[in-house]
Design a protein with these regions (language model features):
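Alpha-helical cap/lid subdomain in secreted, periplasmic
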Residues: 1-143, 147, 151-162
């Protein structure tokens, strides 16, 4: 059976950061809620199976919450940055935690659906220089990060050929 990789770069960190900066006391939702994220993947898995394909999930890459915070607040005033940080509970780690929730959802979905997941998170975290695997924005893969992901995906192809 042919395999298809299901990859979605969205990790729940797409918020209206300007709105948060303007009103850090308000309720703000990501552009793709965790419930919608899981439903979207569940639908894609069903579509792949309906086409006779074996779906394979790919975990989310790591992220650097401090670099990402600097990225999402660039161009903001000091007060707006403080407002965003306040909304995050005073810690940029909340960004990493939100990202991790979406990543864990992928692993749970793979288990429930009995499908394979390519874990790119672990080798990235295991890297001594994991910060070099990310671009300046703290969430986009650098060329080195892309090479690591390609190597992990290559392991699947090598396993299939064996």
């Amino acid at each position: 059976m042919d395999r298809t990789l299901l990859i979605m770069p969205e990790s729940g960190l797409q918020f209206d950061w300007q709105a948060i900066a303007a009103n850090p006391y308000g309720k703000h939702e990501p552009s793709l809620s965790l419930v919608s994220y899981k439903a979207l993947y569940t639908n894609r898995i069903a579509q792949a199976r309906a086409q006779g394909l074996e779906p394979v999930l790919v975990s989310l890459p790591i992220m650097d919450e401090n670099r990402y915070f600097a990225h999402i607040t660039r161009g903001m005033t000091m007060q707006e940055r403080k407002n965003v940080l306040y909304w995050l509970g005073g810690k940029t780690e909340r960004l990493r935690n939100i990202h991790a929730l979406y990543n864990l959802a992928l692993f749970r979905l793979a288990a429930v659906q009995c499908i394979h997941i390519v874990d790119i998170t672990s080798p990235m975290l295991s890297s001594t220089f994991y910060d070099e695997l990310l671009s300046e924005d703290g969430i986009t893969l650098s060329p080195a990060g892309e090479a690591l992901v390609d190597a992990e995906l290559g392991k699947i192809k090598a396993h299939e050929a064996a």
